[in-house]
Amino acid sequence: MFFVLSKTLSLVLEPLVHPFFLLLIALLARWRQRRRLQISCITLAIGLPLFYGFLPFSQGGLMLLENRFPIPKLDERPIDGVIVLGGHTGSGLISQQRGQPQQNGSAERLTMGLKLHQQFPDVPLVFAGFSGNLFHQGWSEAKIVRELLFDLNMSHARILFEKTSRNTYENAVNSRQLLLPQPGSRWILVTSAAHMPRSVGSFEAAGWTGVIPYPVDYKTGTEFERLFSFQLGFEAMRGVFHEFTGLLVYRLTGRSSDLLPGAKDE
């Protein structure tokens, strides 16, 4: 039920539909002869896209999320494994129909996972995730990654797949059941930088200790490359709404250890 509700909520949080919601309210206000409400909604429907396109606002929220955890400097202490969270694969249906494993704009999760596997070849590399779609079709995320690794001739006994999780918290719970991490163990966690706060909160809530966040797939730089862009602004707001709402809901439902997890001093 939680998974279904979260996917339904994501439709409401899509920034592209917000002006249309406001225009619908304006239409209803006109029917009810609420002229002030009608004018306010029309004004917001016009102004909101301009507000979203103002990058210091839209990308500023995303930058806050992406800066919560720095890229770690891996020291000489042993590593017990690497976990790569799903969300980097493309359409499972297209992958199945075309016979080619699809990746999306978050493919850095996969490539960094493979890079870390080269750096630490003697520890498990775990790809976590089944599908984040409400109505899944075609290959699962695990199947897509497995096929890609086969194409690259990288099949290896130390590459494992957690094949059942549908969201971040299930990633944490199911990976823990699969790997049975011991107290004091150190696992590198790879996911998109904006997704890392919710991921760390979920793993800690699921009982993980010693997780080393390794953020990738940055959507913002250290400064704004321009002041205004509809495309970049709406993309940033999509991530902002998704992650901040997810952080709040996860915290309220006990699926995160903190409202906005961040790096801790060792």
Which residue ranges define each predicted feature?
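Extracytoplasmic/luminal low-complexity segments enriched in Pro/Gly and acidic/polar residues
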Residues: 218, 224-228, 233-266
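Transmembrane helix-loop junctions in multipass membrane proteins, especially transporters and channels
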Residues: 35, 64-71, 254-262
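A structural signal for short, hydrophobic/glycine-enriched beta-strand patches
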Residues: 51-234
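Membrane-interface helix-boundary motifs at transmembrane edges
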Residues: 30-39
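Hydrophobic alpha-helical segments of integral membrane proteins
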Residues: 1-9, 57, 61-65, 241-248
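Membrane-embedded alpha-helical segments of integral membrane proteins
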Residues: 1-30
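Hydrophobic membrane-insertion alpha-helices, especially the h-region
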Residues: 40-54
